[in-house]
Amino acid sequence: MEDEISSFFESSPPQKNMEEILENLNEFIKLNSSSQGGRRIVCVTSGGTTVPLEQRCVRYIDNFSSGNRGAASTENFVKAGYAVIFLYRRGTCQPYCRSLPDDPFLECFEFSDKTNIQVHTSHLEAVKMAVMDQQTAVAEGSLLKLPFSTIYEYLQMLRLIAEALKDVGPCSMFYLAAAVSDFYVPWKSMTEHKIESGSGPLDIRLAQVPKMLSVLRSNWAPKAFCISFKLETDSKILMEKATKALRKYKVHAVVANELSTRKEEVVVVSSSGNVVVRRECDKPESFVEDNLIRLIVDRHSTYIKESHN
């Protein structure tokens, strides 16, 4: 497995702006680490990874992930006092923007006269809260946003973040809500230019993406609290696969969610038993992530306490 992981990174295209990303990351961690600012730090991954089919990518394989869970969870982590490294897919849902329309620039604003625009009265409160909450989180140094698109970018940045958080130890957490591709086209076997469509049917052989969770737990950030996710469309196999992932990767909990009910309830699978977490149906503005993050924060507190004993 380690050979496969090494081979994946060695053959991946280099991450753009790596030095700038690392500088921002280290500055953020220094500001918020327990020896400096006293905050716990969580890396929330969000959205889905793309699989390019050409090196100069025109076509790619994608998944449906909108990033809603990662965005909602980030808001709750900030509210709970965490500093959040938000590793997100470009173009997916952002923290504090979930109450805005799909096209906020065009739907939230109107002309006040021929030259000036203003927020439409029907969206005024939502825009005000979104801007205020976002700016407060950034100004207080509790939110760092890092974008990705491809499977290559995501895994290179996840490794970078994990290694940077290694010294933070138990006060760091990984909340891995991103939908990571299981299969990909190795970079060296890709055509450079756009695949021609006039040559008939297209046959593509996909390789399996090496499972990085095990090396994150064992090498990159072994003392960090780690939460992974398992999504299935078949509820009959969901719990079995979540339990298997818990044992195989030695994470602290697996959040099991079934596609059709994922916005209403999830099951947190851990060595101490399974806990069903539901959205509070009597509160229209509530989300399942509200209760989920409360539970995860409590579990993290216990983990930190036990680590210091």
UniProtKB/Swiss-Prot annotation:
InterPro entries per the UniProt record, alphabetical: CoaB-like_sf, DNA/pantothenate-metab_flavo_C
Annotated S-S bridges: none
The reaction(s) this protein catalyses: (R)-4'-phosphopantothenate + L-cysteine + CTP = N-[(R)-4-phosphopantothenoyl]-L-cysteine + CMP + diphosphate + H(+)
GO cellular component entries: cytoplasm; nucleus
Family annotation (Pfam families): DFP
Keyword annotations from UniProtKB, A to Z: Coenzyme A biosynthesis, Ligase
The protein's Enzyme Commission number: 6.3.2.5
Domain of life: Eukaryota
Pathway(s): Cofactor biosynthesis; coenzyme A biosynthesis; CoA from (R)-pantothenate: step 2/5
Biological process according to GO: coenzyme A biosynthetic process
GO molecular function: phosphopantothenate--cysteine ligase activity
The keyword Ribosomal protein is annotated on this UniProt entry: no
Keyword Glycoprotein annotated: no
Function: Catalyzes the first step in the biosynthesis of coenzyme A from vitamin B5, where cysteine is conjugated to 4'-phosphopantothenate to form 4-phosphopantothenoylcysteine.
PANTHER family, per the entry: CORNICHON-RELATED (PTHR12290)
The protein's assembly and partners: Homodimer.
Family the UniProt entry places it in: Belongs to the PPC synthetase family.
UniProt-recorded name of the protein: Phosphopantothenate--cysteine ligase 2
The species this protein was found in: Arabidopsis thaliana (Mouse-ear cress)
Organism phylogeny: Eukaryota, Viridiplantae, Streptophyta, Embryophyta, Tracheophyta
